[in-house]
Every structure is written in structure tokens, then in C-alpha cells.
Amino acid sequence: MKKQNIPEEILSLITEEEINLFQELQIKIKELNNKTNLTRLTDGDDYWVSQVFDSIWPFKAFTNINFDNKKFLDIGSGCGFPGLAYAITHPNSEIYLIDSLKKKTDAIKILVEQINFKNNIHVINDRVENLAHQSSMRNNFNIATTRAVSNPSTVSEYILPMLKKEGFGVLYCGKWTNQESKNLDKTLEILEGKVKDKKEILLPRNKGTRNIILIQSKNFCPEIYPRKVGKPEKNPL
């Protein structure tokens, strides 16, 4: 397949085989989009920068941390990003993709069936507020992330209960302020977590600024979290 329209910043991060899988994924998402409105980010830089690059660069940026061969959770996976992107670039990891909308998880299941992923991939239609109180899911993941779901403090309440001790949460943010940093520190203190690292990047092709906040579980999160559906969003810790 042609790759002249793929930004060089992406080509430097992934292999030829991975490029082919991302192109195949793009085709399948477009086909599903004709039946189900999954995402508007399917063409050109919208796909290659806002979906692919944005999903994978955090796992390349923190070079002191091994993200391979892990149990990975994507909360609110939507059309499969960043979870399926991580799956392509980390084929030895086990992947869990959860979303509360059945049309989204049905579509992701089709993508998983049609594309030759090497991973063991699980797709679950439920809310993290429910799953986090199930023993088979809680404290069960090395890495958990979510993209475009809510503010960092709310997202941390979703992520920390799912992590194993010393597991990592990857928070995708736009601009990052001192007040947001203070709010997050306060929340993490309650949830038995800490900020491990932070990186900022200007996305290729003028797609804006992206901050990644890497959080880590210090101890198991108190069992009362996350709170019932709606409360983390309406009343952040």
C-alpha cells in the first residue's frame, strides 16, 4: 500500500508490518463507519495523526519504562483507539477494550475478527464504574488508559482501581495548567497513586499540543472507588 501521505514522525515509530496493519484498520473503520457512526477521524492527518500517532507516541516516549508483554486496559475505547493501536505496536500484550455503548463494542469486535491481530483481545460492553468492583477486573492491569473521556482527576478515579500495585495509568490531556496539576495531586493522594512522569509534544501537521501524564499506583486503591455512575464526573475528588 502507498504510504506517501503518512507523516514522517509516524514512519519513524513503527515497522512496515505495523504500517500495513494500520492501513488495514483504516479501511475497515471506514467500512463500518458507513453503517455505524464510529468516528469522524478516518482520513489523512485526522487518522494518521489524531488517531494513530496520538495513540502510540506515549508508549515510545517514556523510554525508561517497558510497556511490552503487559495486560492493557482501554477505558471508553470508542472505535478502538488507543487500544488497538497499542495492540498493533505491542503484539505480546493482552488487551481489554471496554465501552458503555454497545454499537461501539459491536464494531470493535468486528475489527478484531477481521484484522490479524497477534494479541489476545477482549471487548467488553459495560461501564468501568461497574467493572472496577468485580474481582476478576479490579487490580488486574499493568497499564490502563483512556482518551477524550473526562478531566484527569475524574479519569484517575476510573484508572487507579483497575491497576496492579505499581501499575501505570496513561492520561491524555490537552494543555496542562498548574491548577490541573494541583487537582490531580490531591486526587491521587486519595486514590493511592502518584504522578510518575509527564511529557508534552506538538502533534505533527499542526494538530495541537498534547500532554501525557503518567501516573502510577503506589498501593491498592480504596475499595469505595470508583463511585457510582455519574459521581466521578459531576463531583471530582
UniProtKB/Swiss-Prot annotation:
InterPro entries: rRNA_ssu_MeTfrase_G, SAM-dependent_MTases_sf
Keywords carried by this UniProt record: Cytoplasm, Methyltransferase, rRNA processing, S-adenosyl-L-methionine, Transferase
Gene3D superfamilies, per database record: Vaccinia Virus protein VP39 (3.40.50.150)
Protein name from the UniProt record: Ribosomal RNA small subunit methyltransferase G
Binding site for S-adenosyl-L-methionine: G76, F81, V128, E129, R147
Organism: Prochlorococcus marinus (strain AS9601)
Compartments, record wording: Cytoplasm
Pfam families registered for this protein in UniProt: GidB (PF02527)
Function, as annotated: Specifically methylates the N7 position of a guanine in 16S rRNA.
Cellular component, GO annotation: cytosol
EC number: 2.1.1.-
Range of residues in the leader sequence: none
Lineage of producing organism: Bacteria, Bacillati, Cyanobacteriota, Cyanophyceae, Synechococcales
Annotated SUPFAM superfamilies: S-adenosyl-L-methionine-dependent methyltransferases
Record keyword Manganese present: no
GO molecular function, one term: rRNA (guanine-N7-)-methyltransferase activity
Principal subcellular localization: cytoplasm
Domain of life, source organism: Bacteria
UniProt record similarity statement: Belongs to the methyltransferase superfamily. RNA methyltransferase RsmG family.
